[in-house]
Each structure stands twice: as structure tokens, then as C-alpha cells.
Amino acid sequence: MVRDGIYYVVAFVAVAILVGYFTIWPLAIIPLLLAFFFGWFFRDPERQIPQTVGAIVSPGDGKVTDIVTVDVNGEPRTRISVFLNIFNVHVNRSPIAGTIREVRYQKGKFGNAMGAISADANEQNIVTVEGEGQTVIFKQIAGLLARRIVFTKKVGDVVGRGERVGLIKFGSRVDVIFTSESDVSVKIGDHVAGGSTILAVARVAHGNAPVLSGTERGGAR
């Protein structure tokens, strides 16, 4: 379980104890059930990180809702959107190994994250990672329920492919934007797992950025 979930669990357990002590114990079942729910909701399972050279992995669990070509500084790029519902794991992971070059917070709306305009209009965190001979942008996008974006890294940090870098509370959307000279490995409607599902493989030269081998360890901070 990620650290952010501990507060919810402890709070509801405390409420259950107080309710059970000052009233009748059956009423304590409700806050206890909520404590179990939040413990499950903020789960943080280990993932097997792919070792494919040039692989771009999904930053989060969810369903692929969009694969389009977008313009980035006058150049065509591929954007894959993954929608996270309330039942998905909400931990976000780096799509590639490399160095974080930019982290930019953008204020915005809290509209339906599945909508086409949410990619630009909604509140979001925009992260640029450079490594393995490529530059990848991924966005943590807020939605109707998800109004709390957490990012645990900073500019200059070196991350491994699939390494935990944050989370979006209560579901939303992550976008990955990368060079169009890549072989896309998923299609719209596919269900993907953060850190382990390969979204695409770049057809570029690769550097020596770190790639975590096997199962990545350690929780989101």
C-alpha cells in the first residue's frame, strides 16, 4: 500500500474504535469496511518490468482509450491515452528509463477524463523523461473524481523504466507522447498494467539509461 493510503486506513480504524467504544459495536463495521476499502484502493503490487530495448511501458493501469497523432513543436508525435477507473491501481510509473528533464504543473478543469478536450483543458502534471535515445512526455491528468495528483520525483532525478513516480487519487487518465518512429504494441480497448505492459517500442538508437531488471522494488513515496 502506498503511503497516501495509510492516512485513510488509520483514520477509519480510529473512527471504528471510537464508534465501538462510545456506541454499539455493530456500527463500527461501517468505518472498518471503509478502512479495508482504502487499503485495497491504495494497493501497490509488484510488477515485472520488461527488458525489451526501447520499450515504452504504460505509466498506469487502465484501458487504452485513444491512439492519435499530435503536433509537438511542429513535429508529429504519437499519443496513447489510458483511462484509470476507480477500481484500477492508481500508482504511476515512468514509461522509460532516463533523466527527468521537466516537470510542469498546469491548472485546469476537472472534466470527464475520457473526453477529448481533457488532454489540454484538465488540471495535469506534464513530465518529460529523456533516455534510451528518446524523449517521452507523460501526463497525469485529473478528472471528475481525481483531484489530487502526486508526483514524487524532481527535475534531474534518474529513473528506471517502470519505476514508481507518483499516483492519481480516485482514478483519471495518463497520456504518453513519444516519437512517431515507434511500433505501437496496443490497440484501443486493451487493458494495460502500469510498468509491465509495453505500449510501443521506439525504433531509435539507445543509450545507457538504467533499466530495472526483474520486479521493481520499493513503494511510491
Curated annotation (Swiss-Prot):
Residue(s) carrying Pyruvic acid (Ser): 172
Cofactor annotation remark: Binds 1 pyruvoyl group covalently per subunit.
Site (Cleavage (non-hydrolytic)): 171-172
UniProt GO molecular function: phosphatidylserine decarboxylase activity
EC identifiers of the protein: 4.1.1.65
Record localization: Cell membrane
GO cellular component: plasma membrane
Catalytic site: 172 (schiff-base intermediate with substrate)
Keywords, ordered alphabetically: Cell membrane, Decarboxylase, Lipid biosynthesis, Lipid metabolism, Lyase, Membrane, Phospholipid biosynthesis, Phospholipid metabolism, Pyruvate, Zymogen
One Pfam family per UniProt: PS_Dcarbxylase
Membrane topology classification: Peripheral membrane protein
Biological process annotations from GO: phosphatidylethanolamine biosynthetic process
Pathway: Phospholipid metabolism; phosphatidylethanolamine biosynthesis; phosphatidylethanolamine from CDP-diacylglycerol: step 2/2
Catalysed reactions, as listed in the record: a 1,2-diacyl-sn-glycero-3-phospho-L-serine + H(+) = a 1,2-diacyl-sn-glycero-3-phosphoethanolamine + CO2
Post-translational modification: Is synthesized initially as an inactive proenzyme. Formation of the active enzyme involves a self-maturation process in which the active site pyruvoyl group is generated from an internal serine residue via an autocatalytic post-translational modification. Two non-identical subunits are generated from the proenzyme in this reaction, and the pyruvate is formed at the N-terminus of the alpha chain, which is derived from the carboxyl end of the proenzyme.
Required cofactor(s): pyruvate
Keyword Lipid metabolism: yes
Family from the record: Belongs to the phosphatidylserine decarboxylase family. PSD-A subfamily.
Functional description taken from the UniProt entry: Catalyzes the formation of phosphatidylethanolamine (PtdEtn) from phosphatidylserine (PtdSer).
Quaternary state and interactors: Heterodimer of a large membrane-associated beta subunit and a small pyruvoyl-containing alpha subunit.
The protein, known as: Phosphatidylserine decarboxylase proenzyme
Organism name: Koribacter versatilis (strain Ellin345)
